[in-house]
Each structure stands twice: as structure tokens, then as C-alpha cells.
Amino acid sequence: MFTNRKILKFLIFFFCFSIFSSIAQTNEDVPLNNMAINEIPKPISSLIFEDFFGNEIDLNDYHGKLVIINFWTTWCAPCKKEMPLLDSLYQDKNFKNLQAFAVNMEQPNKLKTKKFFTDLNIQKLEIFFDQNLNFVKEFKLRGVPTTVLINKKGEEFARIIGEVNFQDKKFSKWLLKYD
């Protein structure tokens, strides 16, 4: 009986060690602590939103591209911090198929959002709006900033909840695999 107990303890230890090792290995592949990667990318429905001038944009038109959708507001301090970093990433010449959308989640106020971008010296990113809250419904958004990553097939493969350093070398290197 005493030997069986030792064997049982060893098996429990081995089982726990195996589980924690696999969890640790999985997390090594995730470049950010606040990122969730979908093991099986989630298909998304066709989403229509508006650019700064009121033109309709259909997300389906961007199949074949790596799409970053960043949800933000003008009053969000982390959004203000990360927007210039996203703008720099969007200008990175290493990315050949990158499309970034900075979607403002407030009631459209063109003067306020334009001033936000001007004050931050945003060069390439454009302002988009989600007046009908299509994104909120589709992605079940709960707060800002939130960034959704969509692969070339039009599927959500990862999501970042909270602030992200888009200039983080580990993140950029990881993201390039999807370009």
C-alpha cells in the first residue's frame, strides 16, 4: 500500500508538471500578456462601417490582407498613448499586406477626432466610425482600447484587450508571420 501511494504521488506530480509545462510553452508563443490567440480563427460576418467622410467601408473588401482594427475613444488615456505606435506600425515597410483601421467608438464628432489625430501627429492612419455599433455586436466589445487582428481569410485570429505597444519587437516579428 505504501508503494502504491508513492506511485500515485509520482503520477499526480508528473501529470501536474506536464500540464504546467504545456501552458508555459503556449504562453511563450503569445507576444503580449493581454493578447488572446484563437486556436481556431473565428469567421466574421460582413461588417459595414464609415470612414471620416461618411463613405461606407465593407470589411469583406479586405480579404487577402492582414487587418488590424483598433477601437478607441478620444477620452481614453491608453488609446492616446498607443495611437502613434499603431501609426508607426502601419507605416512599417516590412509589412506588405497590412491594413489598419482606427475605429472611434464615440458618437461621430469629426472636429474632436480630427484634433485628437492632429495633436498626436498621426500621419497614415485614418479615422473610422461605427455608428450602427456593428463592431460592438460582432466582436462583443466591452471596453477600449481593444484591438482585433484579422487574417487574410477574414477571420479573427487574435485580440488584444487594453493597451498595446505596437512597436514591441517581439510583437512585430510575430505579426509579420501573418502578413
Protein language model regions, located:
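Active-site acidic short loop of glycosyltransferases
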Residues: 63-65, 95, 122-124, 141
